[in-house]
Amino acid sequence: MECNLAQAKQWVSALDQRRFERALQGSGDAFQHVLAIVPLLLHLNHPQLPGYVIHAPSGIASFLASDYQKKWLTNEYGIHYADHKPSTLKSAVNFHEVFPPILGVYVMGSFGSISQTSSSDLDTWICVRDGLSLDEYTLLTQKAKRISEWAMQFNVEINFYLMDQQRFRNEHYADPLTIENSGSAQYMLLLDEFYRSAVRLAGKPLLWLHLWVENEKDYEKEVARLITEGEIDPNDWVDFGGLGQFSANEYFGASLWHLYKGIDSPYKSVLKILLLEAYSKEYPNTCLIARTFKRDLLAGNTNPDHHFDPYIAILAKVTQYLTALSEFKRLDFVHRCFYVKATEDFARYQANNWRIRYMEILAQEWGWSAETVKHLNKRPFWKIKAVKENHDNIMKFLMLSYRNLVEFARKHHIHSSVVPQDINILSRKLYTAFEELPGKVSLLNTQISHNLSEAHLTFVEVRGNKHFKDGWYLINQPIHHIMFSKERVIEYGESLNKLVSWAYFNHLLTEKTELSIFSKNVTLSTLQRFVTNLRQSFPSTIAKQPKNSDLLNQCEIRSLFIAINLTTDPTSKVEEVLTGISSRDLFSFGSLEQSLVGSIDFTYRNVWNEIRTLHFEGQNAILLALKVLSNKIYRGVNRPDSIQVYCYSERYRQDLRQLVMGLVNRCVSIQVGDIQQPCQTSRLRVAGKNWQLFFEDRGISLQEIGNESVCNEAESAVDFDEVLQTPIEDGETNQESRRYPPEMDAFASEGFLQFFFEDNSDHSFNVYILDESNHLEIYRHCDGEKDEKVREINQLYQNAKQEGDKNPYNIVQHNFNYPQFYQLQNGKNGISIVPFKFRQMNK
């Protein structure tokens, strides 16, 4: 394809202007103001201006201030800007005239596309010159952060990313993974997204957009040739390089990243992860959208079907892929996601808005009825059944794409390019958001509907019905309107505690909700008191995302709510009236020696911001509850911020509450290290039997006195002997063989397989393995390379489901319980634990 750079500049500039105009259509004055002023604030570093940081580098290459920017400077701050006389500002502005630190500023993503809405953020790349010092980089980062804070005053969210031109050539990841930064999860796929959507706000043009090369792997050679022959001056351009290094190794990390983004942007993520799936289908000859855009633009095709809109192009690519597979159900859901995303501001749009007009055309092409369009337009006001159906479909189709990409990686023996620390964080974020576990309260995506509150909620208990399994059912109608049927049920829970928690944390249950109950065991007044106590113990809104630092540690309990005798109350059937009894007699009461604690329910929020529930019932409920609690309060961790205990029994309410609260507080205090457990262990008499409680490193063990059988089951740990090749030495005593660094306790996390590497002086290493239940396995003096062990274990995990019974290591693969790897380091202050890092990254 022949194309001169002068002509290419005109076409690229025209496309920038076209996207810029589209971005402003439907946007408010505040958005337009921020967009106009941001480049100026990056260019200047004046004490009076927003974003000022003393000594911060400033100055954008080839910057020319607009009339709007000059007027704003003069009117707001009395500063007079001279375009061609930067020296006039030198006394007030840190101005880099000869070598500006900022080569270019570009906004990317949904900007100017059909998916842009009033709530869309501005993902902005700041390309800095090579050789910027660490101090300069830090100061410029601080300046960008302050500009972001200034923009938030106008309700405009800007995410700045400092980039250098070698980032993608070297695959270095200077910035850690955050809620907006994909870290090491993407390289070429991120560059593909940038090139297909970038709009230059200031600075130098992007060379790649102007230069066509038939084979992308020849891009660097072609650029070098043009420089040698004097056809281009590299100082006139910003060049992040070509897409020739694109590798299928990225699919795994990118799929995790888009699943993670799907927590907050579900409709967009359905499209993006499906694009990855479509890309993988074309492997190894993947046709990237950025290449398609550039080919059409430089060929002079200024009005292609995709309109140079990245999201319209994604839709076309995904449609072609799913149609070829005859997966029309998935395609219909993709259409719905696309429509919902594009019409997010439907209520604010005017009838002549180009986005609305385009979506009306697509709806007709898809053969939608007027009822379908009307239903989707009312999406912000959907109630629970429509929201649940939509939420379940989003989860189903996200996970289907993810599994297809995992299968693709397995089939082609692809290794992930994501570094272990990022995979640890990503997998734990996804585990908390997507993994369905017993007792875990599933939170519906808050982006689907604005208001799920219900005027009436009825809780129905079912026992011994051949048509319904035992448990609790929730219906969003008053009790006198109920014709109980499966069609009317909106949610099921094995325990009342979990069902009430689900309704409360998903905002169906509010202070205005009228409650009803149909149960032989729980009265309406008890239910109402329980709901009131739950509301007093927890805010209904949970913080969106846990911090990365929290995710790198174990999931400590942050807030704990305990309900005694909520669903089973032995005191209501007590016929003996005893006086002068000890509080401990309540666990072995009267001549029948029955425990007056019939049920205990836990509701707790952990530092990963999960809501979990536990239900214990029967004569040994108190013992089971204490044992499980001790396993979840890890040695040496912080004490929970709050522990609330409530009792709902008919009799002995305060006595039972005080007794259980005392035991719980003692259990917690021993586990966190507030008090030292004496050698003589605690004893309890429960339901006519004496029990001894042993407080150990990993929780309480229970033993009936006079009976040598220990209640806690001994489960065997995962056998990784063949991977690590060195079992525990025969000469070690059992006590010596079980010694492990106690610092590991702070990292123990349920649900994950964790590996801790410890280097020895003879260049071998020890490996401590904690399985999903935190059972410990130790391998000492292992040989070989740790990098290879990590890759081998990851491969074993990846193949676990396919190999079935042939899996020699008993790895249990769930959706996001990826093996986690850590390194123990000896320092002056003792042992520290850090995420494991490869010595050499895979390219």
UniProtKB/Swiss-Prot annotation:
Keywords: ATP-binding, cAMP biosynthesis, Competence, Cytoplasm, Lyase, Nucleotide-binding. Induction: Expressed during exponential growth; expression decreases 10-fold on shifting to starvation media. It catalyses: ATP = 3',5'-cyclic AMP + diphosphate. Coiled coil: none annotated. One of its GO terms (molecular function) is ATP binding. It is found in: Cytoplasm. GO terms for biological process: cAMP biosynthetic process; establishment of competence for transformation. Residues 1-542 are annotated as: Catalytic. Residues 549-843 are annotated as: Regulatory. It is an enzyme of class 4 (lyase). It holds the Pfam family Adenyl_cycl_N. Disruption phenotype: Loss of competence, the ability to bind, take-up and integrate exogenous DNA. Loss of the ability to ferment ribose or xylose. One of its GO terms (cellular component) is cytoplasm. Its EC number is 4.6.1.1. Belongs to the adenylyl cyclase class-1 family. Plays an essential role in competence development. This is Adenylate cyclase. It comes from Haemophilus influenzae (strain ATCC 51907 / DSM 11121 / KW20 / Rd).
